[in-house]
Amino acid sequence: MKQQLLLLEDVDGLGRSGDLITARPGYVRNYLIPKKKAVIAGAGTLRLQAKLKEQRLIQAAADKADSERIAQALKDIVLEFQVRVDPDNNMYGSVTIADIIAEAAKKNIFLVRKNFPHAHYAIKNLGKKNIPLKLKEEVTATLLVEVTSDNEYVTVLAQGKQTEENQEG
């Protein structure tokens, strides 16, 4: 039998702080109550619910302003990657989300995997790509990633072929 609860914190997939929700008893007993993420709804929780919703609105406004500021700053950022390619400009491997996060950290832009709505996103060809990011309060941003070839490897291959042809001829 499901129990009615008042969430004290945002819980992914369940609700936001101040929401009245229902959940299964095991989830309530083993996770929500011990982690202090919810309280069992009763007559006294209505005042607490109003207070939590007011706090959530204030926090949401601050988060949205921060997210919009971050989105504006990300418009001017270009992350550049040089990758090895074969003579036909086919990449060896790909540029993954982990690569993007690491390169962004070098520029003091700290992203986490949950910022990327497409978790298995990988760039597998050369060129410029706009990567969508999901920030707080449903604010979205785009990050420009430019993938170029590392011509050294292609040059080494071409020189190797030329020396083979010279030795044959």
Swiss-Prot record:
Pfam families: Ribosomal_L9_C, Ribosomal_L9_N. One of its GO terms (biological process) is translation. Keywords: Ribonucleoprotein, Ribosomal protein, RNA-binding, rRNA-binding. GO terms for molecular function: rRNA binding; structural constituent of ribosome. SUPFAM superfamilies: L9 N-domain-like, Ribosomal protein L9 C-domain. The keyword Ribosomal protein applies. One of its GO terms (cellular component) is ribonucleoprotein complex. Belongs to the bacterial ribosomal protein bL9 family. HAMAP family: Ribosomal_bL9. Binds to the 23S rRNA. This is Large ribosomal subunit protein bL9. The lineage of its organism: Bacteria, Pseudomonadati, Chlamydiota, Chlamydiia, Chlamydiales.
